[in-house]
Swiss-Prot record:
It comes from Homo sapiens. This is UDP-glucuronosyltransferase 1A1. Homodimer. Homooligomer. Interacts with UGT1A3, UGT1A4, UGT1A6, UGT1A7, UGT1A8, UGT1A9 and UGT1A10 to form heterodimers. Isoform 1 interacts with isoform 2/i2 suggesting that oligomerization is involved in negative regulation of transferase activity by isoform 2. Isoform 1 also interacts with respective i2 isoforms of UGT1A3, UGT1A4, UGT1A6, UGT1A7, UGT1A8, UGT1A9 and UGT1A10. Changing residue 377 to V: In CN1 and CN2. Changing residue 71 to R: In CN2, GILBS and HBLRTFN; has significant residual bilirubin glucuronidation activity of about 25% to 50% of that of the wild-type protein; displays no change in biluribin affinity; decreased SN-38 glucuronosyltransferase activity. It is a single-pass membrane protein. Changing residue 402 to T: In CN1; has no residual bilirubin glucuronidation activity; N-glycosylation does take place at this new additional site.
């Protein structure tokens, strides 16, 4: 018995090491081309985990990046671009400022179109400088990367991937105009899948379905303005005719920072993997400063307030209306705000330039979260079970807010039209009405009830693509069909032609028989008449 016990110890130890330790069969080399801003920040957890598992990571970014800097767990390579960091910052800041301008619908459309065109031209010039940097491209080709991990929001990185013949893993939340579903050949029916920026739920009225279809058609025009220049650039650089859909459909695996707890159920494809909540797994201890704020709040607890990094300043009148509402609740409010301090700011409201959002939301004394409904904040709220007051500002935030409101996890306010009383009532509702807390806790329970953590799942698929040089077995044959073959229009046309041909022949035969029969009767009658006479 003793011998068996001693012999079993190494076996148990080995099993524990296999389960607990990072086992990597092959330490690979990963080329990462991110998109600046929150897109980049969302990738950091996965990058760090991949580095801890022994992989070498090279991050390629323009030298004018705002957020992409040197890091301890990756090597940063930069390339020169024809714009400065200040230009990028101005683009981010202006986006936040434009939100609070109370323009007419037509003015907003014109301003949005001009801004998109201006920003797109700047980003396209950066892509062109990267592709035509012969020394850098040669260096990348010689580096023998195993895989590219990238956010395809800008389709420059897929061009690089095709040039280097690298299998690619896309890491994203969503693409404009539902391009991700076109690129994966995923069914995307208008009838129950709301289009981006529609603010519809998956249960639409007839008129909403009409609007949903019209939005899809109009977005195609907008996306053509943004993305068609990349197709031209790619065709010139790769020396073959390439469309944006060709570039995007080359991905081996798509890692989506979403799941069906937040989003509505819809069709998916085999190479679409969902890793929603990847950024809210780990919490750090709060600093003494924030612990002191929470302890001083007493039994009422705290409210966390952040509208994201793009909103640095709110118009004075609106800021005062917000401050007035915050002063009318008993909770302590931690407001991340770098603008001018409102003159009527109450004693219960503390302005901070930065706050550990996920760590604060995870504290049991947090009662509510005032947010712009960005995907990061929404998932942190779901993970930690904190009901929301949502003030969506732009982009997919409107859709995120609609989804959470539909699920009973928060209240949505129009930031331009809301009054101080509206905000006060919304806060009191989500704090005092138990249904909001119960609903967000139910979503949190559903979100956490899974066999694999999102971060581990993302890392697995990156390594999977590295090991197998892609994932062609997950690629549907729909990619190889023409549009009329995909919709079986040729088959329908053929069957229709057969039916019409058979119908025509049948008609002709019947007509011929009828004429023959009629002619025979006529001759019989004629013969009968001649006999009687």
């Amino acid at each position: 018995m003793a011998v068996e016990s001693q012999g079993g110890r190494p076996l148990v130890l080995g099993l524990l090491l296999c389960v607990l330790g990072p086992v990597v069969s092959h330490a690979g080399k990963i080329l990462l081309i991110p998109v600046d801003g929150s897109h980049w920040l969302s990738m950091l957890g996965a990058i760090q985990q991949l580095q801890q598992r022994g992989h070498e990571i090279v991050v390629l970014a323009p030298d004018a990046s705002l957020y992409i800097r040197d890091g301890a767990f990756y090597t940063l390579k930069t390339y020169p671009v024809p714009f400065q960091r200040e230009d990028v910052k101005e683009s981010f800041v202006s986006l936040g400022h434009n939100v609070f301008e109370n323009d007419s619908f037509l003015q907003r459309v014109i301003k949005t179109y001009k801004k998109i065109k201006k920003d797109s031209a700047m980003l396209l010039s950066g892509c062109s400088h990267l592709l035509h940097n012969k020394e850098l491209m040669a260096s990348l080709a010689e580096s023998s990367f195993d895989v590219m991990l990238t956010d395809p929001f800008l389709p420059c990185s897929p061009i690089v991937a095709q040039y280097l013949s690298l299998p690619t893993v896309f890491f994203l939340h969503a693409l404009p105009c539902s391009l991700e579903f076109e690129a994966t050949q995923c069914p995307n029916p208008f009838s129950y899948v709301p289009r981006p920026l529609s603010s519809h739920s998956d249960h639409m009225t007839f008129l909403q379905r009409v609007k949903n279809m019209l939005i899809a058609f109009s977005q195609n025009f907008l996306c053509d303005v943004v993305y068609s220049p990349y197709a031209t650039l790619a065709s010139e650089f790769l020396q073959r005719e390439v469309t944006v859909q060709d570039l995007l459909s080359s991905a081996s695996v798509w890692l989506f920072r979403s799941d069906f707890v937040k989003d509505y159920p819809r069709p998916i494809m085999p190479n679409m993997v969902f890793v929603g909540g990847i950024n809210c797994l780990h919490q750090n201890p709060l600093s003494q400063e924030f612990e002191a704020y929470i302890n001083a709040s007493g039994e009422h607890g705290i409210v966390v307030f952040s509208l994201g990094s793009m909103v640095s300043e709110i118009p004075e009148k609106k800021a005062m209306a917000i401050a007035d509402a915050l002063g009318k609740i008993p909770q302590t409010v931690l407001w991340r705000y770098t603008g001018t301090r409102p003159s009527n700011l109450a004693n219960n409201t503390i302005l901070v330039k930065w706050l550990p959002q996920n760590d604060l939301l995870g504290h049991p004394m947090t009662r509510a979260f005032i947010t712009h409904a960005g995907s990061h904040g929404v998932y942190e709220s779901i993970c930690n079970g904190v009901p929301m007051v949502m003030m969506p500002l732009f982009g997919d935030q409107m859709d995120n807010a609609k989804r959470m409101e539909t699920k009973g996890a928060g209240v949505t306010l129009n930031v331009l039209e809301m009054t101080s009383e509206d905000l006060e009532n919304a806060l009191k509702a989500v704090i005092n009405d138990k249904s909001y807390k119960e609903n967000i806790m139910r979503l949190s329970s559903l979100h956490k009830d899974r066999p694999v953590e999102p971060l581990d799942l993302a890392v697995f698929w990156v390594e999977f693509v590295m090991r197998h040089k892609g994932a062609p077995h997950l690629r549907p044959a729909a990619h190889d069909l023409t549009w009329y073959q995909y919709h079986s229009l040729d088959v329908i046309g053929f069957l229709l032609a057969v039916v019409l041909t058979v119908a025509f022949i049948t008609f002709k035969c019947c007509a011929y028989g009828y004429r023959k029969c009629l002619g025979k009767k006529g001759r019989v009658k004629k013969a009968h008449k001649s006999k009687t006479h």
